[in-house]
Structure formats: structure tokens, C-alpha cells
Amino acid sequence: MQIKTKAIVISSLKFQEKSLIVKCFTLSNGLKSYFVRDAFSSRKASQKIAYFQPLSILEIEAVHKNKGTLENFKEIKTAVPFQTIHTDIFKSTIVMFLSEMLHYSIQEEEKNEPLFVFLETALTWLDHHDDISNFHLILLLEITKYLGFYPDVSEIDLPYFEMKEGIFTLFHTSTALSEHETNLLKKLLDLKFDNSQKVFHVVERQILLRVLIDFYSAHLDGFKKPKSLDILKEIFS
């Protein structure tokens, strides 16, 4: 089946000497993996590699066999031409980390249009703004809405957050956050991209990042801690 759709690049992996395997989150079909033959074989072919930087947003034409095998691109072009995301060291570190988080979080080949639209909007915002120190925290929390485990805030006045149940509780359990961690999470729940400046200091951001990764681990089978986590911590320390 031939399709035309937008796609967000999640990862690209060199295969043998000249080819690439590219994983994309597509608007039309969810997660798909594509084989790019001879991506490194010539100057013209190697220009394609620029399309596959982390979280690039593409317009693709592809042949989908939908048999669980690698699919093939027919045509690729940039859908959203980013100006700063892949050149600014802070932003490029964020997208490298977030692409790893999405790699381990989006696990099914099924359409999730609301998540795609949210990610496209968020990445466009990141490209056009400079006050981004809390961007990754807000994004990771918001993504849980679309993956089905956003915190239940109906009892948000209670002092502890229970990670496995995703609820606020009166009593501290073995899988609950401390009261201090819970208060930081409550502050994060109130934030949007446009009102997040200077809310947390460095240590608080690192606590929240650990909390969010643990939260993902508690709710997603097979989730792994991103290898780029230490780089992100270093950049924002």
C-alpha cells in the first residue's frame, strides 16, 4: 500500500556499511521502520542522511507492506524546516534525549494522531524559543496523557504521589514519592511551555527528571533509561 504522510524521526541506525534503518512515528500509521539502501554510497545519497536527524519532521511517500518487515521510502522531504533545533547545543541535546525516550515509549504500530499533533506543536515551539530549561520535563509529563498514564489529579491536595497507581494519596507507600518530590511534581503539573521560566533550580530539575523516568519505567514494559541522560544532565547543570 502506498501512503503519503508526515513522520517524526525517532532513530536511525547504520546497517552494514552503506545503509540505514530509520524508525519513524508516522501520522497515518504510528510507528514504522524503514530501510534506506546505500545511504552512504555517494555524495547525493549521503545528503539524505540530513533528513534523519533526531525528531526531524518529514513529509514522506512510502510503500507499506504491513507485514512486520522493514518498509521503503519512495520520496522524502522536510515538512517542518527547523532553524535552531539541530544547531543549538542545548536544543540538540534535548531532542537527542527525547528521541530516546520516545523510542522506548511508543511501542505499537497503530495510529495516535493526537500524540503526533502534540509533538509537532511542541517541537515547533522549541525551535522558536530560548527559555527551554524546563521544556523536556513538561513534554515528558504531557506525553503521558497520550500514552494513558497521566497522573490522576482529582486528589492533588493529598501529600504523596503513588507512582504505580498514578494517584495522590494520604499515606506514604514504598512506591510513593516523598513529600518534597510530590510538591515538585505538583508545580510541574501547573506548567505550560510559555510559563515555565525560572520555576525550578538545577537540583529540582534533576529530581523531577529522575521522577519522570521512574514513572515511565513503572508504566511501560521494556522501558530503558536513555543513554543520553548523563549528557542532558551535564548540559543543564
UniProtKB/Swiss-Prot annotation:
Protein name per its UniProtKB record: DNA repair protein RecO
Q: Which domain of life is it from?
A: Bacteria
InterPro entries in UniProt: ARFGAP/RecO (IPR037278), DNA_rep/recomb_RecO_N (IPR022572), NA-bd_OB-fold (IPR012340), RecO (IPR003717)
Q: What is the role of this chain?
A: Involved in DNA repair and RecF pathway recombination.
UniProt xrefs under HAMAP family: RecO
Organism the protein comes from: Flavobacterium johnsoniae (strain ATCC 17061 / DSM 2064 / JCM 8514 / BCRC 14874 / CCUG 350202 / NBRC 14942 / NCIMB 11054 / UW101)
Family listed = Belongs to the RecO family.
Keyword annotations of the record = DNA damage, DNA recombination, DNA repair
Q: Name one GO cellular component term.
A: bacterial nucleoid
- Stored PANTHER family: DNA REPAIR PROTEIN RECO
Q: Does the keyword DNA damage apply?
A: yes
Question: One Pfam family from the UniProt entry?
Answer: RecO_C
**One of the GO BP terms on file:** double-strand break repair
The primary gene name is: recO
